[in-house]
Every structure is written in C-alpha cells, then in structure tokens.
Amino acid sequence: MINRTSIIKQPDKISSFCDVYKLQKKYQDALISGKSNIDFIWLGEHQLCYTIGRGSNMGNLLFSLDEQDVFKIDRGGEVTCHMPGQLVTYLVLDLHNFNKDLNWYLRKIEKIIIKVLSSFNIDSSTKDGFTGVWTGERKIASIGIGCKRWVTIHGFSINVNCKLENFDKIVPCGIQGCQMANMSDYKKNLDIKEVKIIVKKIIQEEFYFNFISE
C-alpha cells in the first residue's frame, strides 16, 4: 500500500469534547470537498462527558440531562463516557484510499486496539455480535464511528486508568450488565503517555502513515 500523509495532534492537556469535535469536522469537510487530501489523527483525553450516537436509546442514560455534559453526535453506537485517564483516538480518514467497507474499518480498529493491549501484555479479544474489545468479560475499549462520503469521523477509546464509576451512570454501549475495565487493572503504575506512544506507532503501521504536524 502507498504511504499516506496524516496530520497528528497529541495534546497533553485535557481537551473539551466540543473543541475537538469541531476540529474533526473541519478536517472531514476539507477531505470531502477536495480542499485537502491529508488525513487527520487526534490522540488525547477529554473532560468528563457522555456522548450518544444516532438512534441511541435515551433510557441508557441513568441520570437527568441537566446533571452532566451530554452530546448527541453523528456516530453509530450507543451511549459512552469520556473522562481523564481514558485515551481517545479520533481518525478522520478518506476510505477511498484504503477500503470502502465499514465492516473492514471496524475490524481494523479492533485489531489496532488488541495489538496495543498486547504490547502491554494484556490479553484481549472481540465478542461475536458486538463492536469493541474485552479483557475476559469486561469491556476495556469502545468504538464509535461516523462516515460521510467515505470520510470517517470519531474513533475509539481505551480505558487506561480512569474512574470506572463514571460508567455506572449509563448502560455502556447499550449492553445490559456490561462491566468495564482499565489497563491499569492488569499493569500497575501505567502512564497514559506510554499508551499514546504505542497507539500512534500501531496506527502508523496499520495504515502506512507518514505523520506530520500542522
């Protein structure tokens, strides 16, 4: 496969969900309109918030909407939670240059997550009928994507050392009884910066990217 160029942003500070969403849309619109042919990757952490996908069941929010920041966004999937200690990765990719197949793309993301976890000697797997990655019976990574004219938006999150009790306020991904896990449950004293380095490396390998800064 021919190497692709992608802009990458990796802020150290905790980022507002709204600000990063606007950034994704800017790059998605540029790819769709033909103003740019450069993909965009963002790796970082968000302030505590909840997001719900298209057609989500509002009954999976177990709190009043005025209690927390909730964003209804243009991705598939149900409700999930973002917070410090969770590494979020957004990929704005033109699938014309890879494979115009969303099932292929979702399986590719799962493969990336499993390889990341394996790099830290954490065994993980997928589950038939579900999207995401599990360690045993607990979910450690969630995936939610949007796609317009074969240009993707949103991506995946891996729980590194976040406050898992924040998931108690929702039915995670619409899965009743779903229990969540952190990477730090299996590898103590884990720094999210270490995970960020590996995620970047594996994305680069899997998509044949040449990364540049804007």
UniProtKB/Swiss-Prot annotation:
Record-linked PROSITE patterns: BPL_LPL_CATALYTIC (PS51733), LIPB (PS01313)
Catalysed reactions, as listed in the record: octanoyl-[ACP] + L-lysyl-[protein] = N(6)-octanoyl-L-lysyl-[protein] + holo-[ACP] + H(+)
Pathway membership, UniProt: Protein modification; protein lipoylation via endogenous pathway; protein N(6)-(lipoyl)lysine from octanoyl-[acyl-carrier-protein]: step 1/2
Gene Ontology cellular component list: cytoplasm
Keyword Cytoplasm: yes
Gene3D superfamilies: Bira Bifunctional Protein, Domain 2 (3.30.930.10)
Stored InterPro entries: aa-tRNA-synth_II/BPL/LPL, BPL_LPL_catalytic, Octanoyltransferase, Octanoyltransferase_CS
Residue(s) at site: Lowers pKa of active site Cys: K139
EC number of the protein: 2.3.1.181
Any single Pfam family the record assigns to this protein: LplA-B_cat
GO MF: lipoyl(octanoyl) transferase activity
Any one GO BP annotation for this protein: protein modification process
Misc. comment: In the reaction, the free carboxyl group of octanoic acid is attached via an amide linkage to the epsilon-amino group of a specific lysine residue of lipoyl domains of lipoate-dependent enzymes.
Name by which UniProt lists this protein: Octanoyltransferase
Source species: Prochlorococcus marinus (strain MIT 9515)
